[in-house]
Amino acid sequence: MKIVQRFLTAVLMMSAVTACAKIDPTSEPVREMGQFKLGHNVVVAENAQPGPLTRSTNAEELEKALTTAMDERLGQYDGDRLIHIGIAVDGYVLALPGVPLVLSPKSVLALTVNVWDNETQEKLNAEPRRFAVFERGAAETVVGSGLTQNKAAQLENLSRNAALKIQNWILENPEWIGLTAEDSSAEDAAQ
């Protein structure tokens, strides 16, 4: 009887966590980006430092995953203001398989991002913006993505989350893309 009780408790906990999971970045509605048009999408991962307990990867795989995710999320906008985005991958952890519910490491990317305006040839952000990007909460990552996902899936998940974070950061600075604070607030209220 206790085994059944434990099993049901585990199922309920998994269901609760799944219900509270974050939205998949690829299923979010298209957001108003004003005059934004993605120019150069530059990702550099040559100096990326692996964290503890990580699967191995290389600069090429990191760069490809992030470039693809940025194109997927921001390449669809066709405004009049060409914006260049430069991303440096500072570090990463691609979770190894662990022991469920005891040691279930999470994946993370550490990024430094800069944004430039093509017309003025000036950097829009005064200081480089640093991001720590974690895997999204979902049923398949509850016990650690190292157990349920291969390296490619982990990289794709992290890269899509990074692209969403960068988009949200740009939207926090509406003047960069020809939006007013009111436009940005109205967009947030509509969602």
Q: Locations of the language-model features?
A:
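Sec/Tat-exported extracytoplasmic proteins
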Residues: M70-D78, V93, A162, I166-P174
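N-terminal, post-signal-peptide region of Sec/Tat-exported proteins
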Residues: S56-L82
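Bacterial N-terminal signal peptides that target proteins for export
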Residues: M1-L8
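Surface-exposed short loop/turn segments
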Residues: D78-N125, R136-T148
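Short secondary-structure boundary motifs at beta->alpha junctions and helix caps
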Residues: A48-S56, N125-K165
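A structural "domain/chain start" motif
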Residues: C20-K64, E175-Q191
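C-terminal/domain-edge helix-coil "capping" segments
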Residues: A21, V142-Q191
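C-terminal motif of bacterial Sec signal peptides marking the signal peptidase cleavage site
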Residues: S15-A19
